[in-house]
A protein has these predicted regions:
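Conserved S/T- and glycine-rich ATP-binding loop of Class I adenylate-forming
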Residues: 78, 163, 295
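Conserved beta-strand hairpin/beta-sheet module of binuclear metal-dependent hydrolase folds
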Residues: 15-67, 172-186
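Metallo-beta-lactamase
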Residues: 8-25, 51, 58, 103-247
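Short glycine/proline-enriched coil/turn segments at helix->beta-strand junctions
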Residues: 48-50, 68-73, 89-95, 176-179, ...
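Active-site HxH/HxHxD metal-binding segment of metal-dependent hydrolases
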Residues: 34, 39, 58-152
Length: 316
């Protein structure tokens, strides 16, 4: 494969900034700007008989660097979120594979914005934010994949696993010989699971976490936290446990009658609204509504004239 500028391995190969971290001899983490935190994400580079790039949210400059040093043969998206697909346009003549669930709208910023926001004004704000923060440009997919698809790059093979909840089109990829699970936005971050879109579902998210756990991975690679090799079961417990923590917080807040607007102003899921406040408030409301529906179904909350109140004190 020749000289490898930018690969950060135990041998200490030199490049500044170091943007590639070896996971296996053929798989590398392409570090995202801002340490992979939103609005960026880490990407995955496969260098085998086929060179493939998974997700393009690491930053436009890093993609241009990659294009010069390790030009991919194809691009794959894990799901249609704007911090995972904004740089698809950097590779205009390559095959672009996306989940079958989002093939019809991936790469079209007008369609994605409307799907993720539900109002014309919020859609406009979303487009403005995404273009400014990520460098997003439209780039249409050429093909799609589904649950159980096997990507074969040579000696490296990845199995696509549909893991909805975060979005309807969220996938994980498994490298079966080494037990590596690429979980993308099931990211094991301290914030916990995110499910703020109309097609996001808490129950699906919990089921997807259990699907990952059942793989018994020896390593997890996430889009925002990078490589995780220690205490994987415990990390999954803590991450998934945030859902129950949020519901306890909601129940504590509903010790007296509260309106939905009071809950949004809390806020009870986001700690605050540090940017794009209208969008964050919208997603806070969506996530609160999903929790309230679950709590209503369980008889833990009841509707009132003004909003909601809990029916019993939450368990510790």
């Amino acid at each position: 494969m020749g000289h490898d500028p930018g690969i950060d391995t135990a041998k200490g190969l030199r490049y500044t900034p170091r943007v590639l971290v070896e996971i296996t001899p053929h798989i590398f983490l392409l570090r995202g700007e801002n340490n992979g935190l939103f609005p960026f994400s880490h990407s995955i580079l496969i260098r085998d008989e086929v060179t493939a790039l998974i997700d393009t949210g690491c930053g436009i400059e890093r993609l241009e660097w990659l294009k010069e040093h390790y030009p991919p043969d194809l691009v794959i998206n894990s799901h249609a979120h704007p911090d995972h697909i904004p740089g698809n346009w950097v590779f205009p003549h390559l095959p672009l594979l996306v989940p079958c669930q989002s093939f019809d709208y991936t790469g079209r910023i007008d369609l994605v914005s409307e799907r993720f926001t539900e109002s014309k004004e919020l859609a406009r704000q979303w487009r403005d934010f995404v273009r400014g923060a990520t460098g997003f440009r439209d780039a249409l997919p050429t093909d799609h994949y589904d649950d159980g698809h096997r990507f074969r790059f040579g000696s490296t093979e990845l199995l696509a696993l549909h893991c909805p909840g975060h979005t309807c089109d969220s996938y994980c990829f498994l490298e079966p010989t080494r037990g590596i699970a690429f979980t993308f936005d099931m990211d094991l971050s301290p914030f916990g699971p995110w499910y703020g879109h109309p097609d996001s579902e808490i129950d699906d998210f919990e089921a997807s976490l259990e699907r990952v756990r059942a793989l018994k991975p020896r390593m997890i690679v996430s889009s925002h936290m990078g490589i995780v090799t220690e205490d994987i079961d415990a990390r999954l417990d803590v991450y998934g446990g945030v859902i129950a923590q949020r519901e306890r917080r909601i129940l504590n807040f509903l010790s007296e009658e509260r309106t939905l607007e009071e809950m949004i102003q809390g806020p009870l899921i986001y700690n605050n609204y540090p940017f794009a406040a209208d969008l964050l408030r919208h997603w806070e409301e969506n996530m609160l509504r999903k929790h309230l529906r679950r709590l209503l179904e369980r008889g833990l909350v009841q509707p009132t004239e003004k909003g909601y109140v809990r029916t019993a004190k939450p368990a510790d």
